[in-house]
Amino acid sequence: MIKKLSLISLFTLLPASFYFAQTTVYAYVKDQEGKPVESAEIDLVQSTDDVKADKIGYFQFVDLQPGQYQINVSKPNFETKVIEFTVSANEKRRDLGVISLLPAPFANAGVMVIDDAASDSDEDGSSMQPTIGLLNSGRDIFQSVTAFELGAYWFRPRGVDNRYEDVIFNGVSMSKNDDGRVDFSNWGGLNDVTRYPYESVDNITPSAYTFGNLGGVVYYNTRASSYRKQTSLAYSFTNRSYRHRAMATYSSGLSKNGWAFTLSASRRWAEEGVIDGTQQNSYAYFGAIEKQFSSRHAINLTAFGAPTYRASNAPNTQEVYDLMGKNYNSYWGWQDGEKRNSRIRKTFEPIFMLTDYLKLGKTSNWTNTFSYQFGSDSRSRLDWFHGTDPNPTYYRKLPSYFFSKALELESDGGNDVTADELAEIEAVRNSWQTDSNVSQINWDALYRANYLNKTGMNGEKRGAIYTMVEDVNEDKTFNYSSHFDTMLQPNWKLNLNFNYQNLKSDNFRRVSDLLGADFAYNLNAFGGDNPYNVDDTNVEVREGDRTQYNYLLYRSSYAFNASTELDLPKWNVMGSIFSSYSESQRDGKYRHHYYLNTSKGKSGIYDALDGGVKGRVTYKIDGRNFIVYNGAFFSVAPTLNEIFVNPRVNERMTPGVSNQIINSNDLGYIHRGQVLKIRLSGYYTTISNSTDISRYYLEGGGDDNSAIGAPNAFIAEVLSGADKRYMGVELGLDVKVTPTLNANLVASVGDYEYTNNPKAYSYSDVDRTYFAADQEFGEANIKGLKVAGTPQKAFSLGLKYNSTKFWWLGVSANYLMDQYLDFSVINRTANFYTNPRTGDIYTATTGEYTGFDIPEANAENVAALLKQQKFDDQFMLNANAGKSFLIGKYRMGVSVSVNNILNNRDYVTGGFEQGRKSNFAASYEDNLNAEKGGYALFAPKLWYDRGTTFFANVYLRF
């Protein structure tokens, strides 16, 4: 009797919800033809209870408590559908019926194009990098719009550089060891197999597969059986960096004996892109083969690569654009009736991955991947030895130079420029616009110069004046990654990740074309004709030989990451920690004549220890409303390019280089309704102790006579210990006006700036007189200057009509604000306003060249000269449309997207100050040249938007 009473007492203490009938909710997922959508993912919002549809499209959730729920039903190539439902007390089973998924218009259209040509420039091109925001397009309205609409105009969410983003294939990071950036060209053109990531998290949200960085994680699982069984053919026509794209993809699905195959190939090509002289011929291939030994064990072999040949385009000063138009490109010239570009990027870095999938018990999985990547990345350019600069935009060849010379002749205070001088200037301008031998590279003249120089006065053989060379990077990277996950409890998940990577990077310059000469000299024309390698007595080099620099870089790293997620009725909590260790070393193969003791052989080892923590806390107000906090505090080890400041010539490590410290927080509100969806968030991020290095070629050198015999000096401007702050708010609204019409509004208001005055240095691989070795300039006065490379404010208003007849039409109005010019580091130091002859601040004087009055270099006058340029705000109009068809068992679709419909050519997508006039007097005189009616000789170099661009696509799937 006592036992019975005890049991009765125990049951009376149980919560009332225990007595409610726990409910099973089920449904069927089908496509527009009524066929089951196998493996559709059903996400029970803010819960770890996610399931997949089986072979007949069926899924169910069991033991749901009474309450309001929301599920997201998704599958690659289909639009995600959101379903809301209520579970009532005493309801044993709830039938949601048939959930129909429609083909995703953008998935079929292929209109999202990552222009990997943006990373080709070596003219301070770091501010012109694509971001993984372009890959992160399907999660919510804010990310979709910033990818498709604003991303086309180089908008970066939260101002985050590509350096702080992660793209992962099967546990292997695609970030390059030299600069930390993702090189999208390694898989460019493989849209069919990389369209849908396995995991995609934005910003600092913790990931299950890696700790990540500041700018989010995109994770791809290339398991062959994960791709939908089908054959896909597609052709695209566009006027962007290429004209044509053809793709073919085949996925076998999983056979009865456990085999699965996925193959994909593509080609992108153009005789000439929208920018003059930019031809392209790029291929890509992908193969994945999987063998399932049982339901618990499988292996998968993946291989992909993208052999790419692509011509680059140059940034120009405003004078050049005004002369020749926005599509002008100085890198090409006519040769034998064809356009030949001097700046060609050729890449082919295939990667092979072997992945083992093992299921342990009922709730644990262990995945291991071994990978090996190798290949070459080369970028060509013209080089010269005791010759004049062949670049048509060299400042002495421009009308502004002749205008400045005319001003010099009028230093007596009379008329600025005479009529005869104006006529001469006009003749120069006219020759630019009518004679391609003036406005473009004159290849015939280069061949002729080499031919006439083959033999000296005494009959001796002489080497080339002009050559084509390639800067080559050949990496060999081995990687091992391991991922383990387990459910500790039904609502508690644990992830463990380990990664080891080993890199050997071979870097050198190679002679690619002697331009008719018999050989070239491995001599420094700007260094007394001393050999670049004093240990080699043979200074003659021929096509295919290495020249000027030759060194290896080594890096090995180990990383461990653990993350956990706990789901509670009103809360969802996720935390992640990591630690990593890396070693980096340089091994020089040439003994440079300037650095006899520090150029050849192995350097010391630079080691770095990293660590950090991330967290996310979600409070579930109810089934539709959530408050989400993300926080992160971690360090980032410097890249190889940040460690070795001038590796072409010596082993010198960047002064003060050490780990960056990142502290980032954001707080957001999310509403997910049937009619209205809202995402509102605010963020605050600091990056401390960063090393920022701008590398570029300085045309000519340091003085007015250096055009003769001076190859382009390779300059490194260094900011050591820079602090930056990023803060702002983001808003995304999606309103279902009618069942077929959606309206969306996206706003991003940011403020990104430098918050301290770091140390500045400058290095050159050629000229020790103008840029002395290890030259320190003291503090750079950059506090308060804006971070360049992205509009800091952006707005988009869009409408999209989805017809029940399987066609759609979308339009968006976009407004971009607060885009800034990248600044010259040296111009922000005391060197700028200090007279090198006296060591004092410049006093009021008469111009050395023009004879005009130059004021004192006081704070007001210096600030006026160095004010950071802010570009004008711009409006862009985009549209897209498409339709899909069913023809028997075949699915066909056509689509077209048009960006910048109004052909706005005033939008500056990026630019940088030149560092040639790095003192107050010279800079003031240069600006006077513009004020008197000409142009500044060393004005900023800019990139402009390409105007109206389109992308048309047709596909066939069966």
Please provide the spans of the model-predicted regions:
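Transmembrane beta-barrel wall of Gram-negative outer-membrane proteins
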Residues: T23-Y26, S232, F237-W269, V274-N313, ...
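Periplasmic N-terminal accessory/gating domains of Gram-negative outer-membrane beta-barrel systems
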Residues: F85-P206, R268
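A beta-strand signature from Gram-negative outer-membrane beta-barrel systems
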Residues: I99, G188-A234, R245
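Acidic/polar loop-and-plug regions of large Gram-negative outer-membrane beta-barrel proteins
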Residues: E290, A298-T355, S378-V469, G528-R542, ...
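Surface-exposed extracellular loop regions of Gram-negative outer-membrane beta-barrel proteins
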Residues: A311, P315-V320, E540, E583-Y594, ...
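Signature of Gram-negative outer-membrane beta-barrel scaffolds
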Residues: T467, K493-D622, E642, P647, ...
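Gram-negative outer-membrane beta-barrel transporters
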Residues: K570, Y684, A713-I826, N953-R957
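C-terminal beta-signal and adjacent terminal beta-strands/loops
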Residues: I687-N689, Y815-Y849, D853-A857, K883-F958
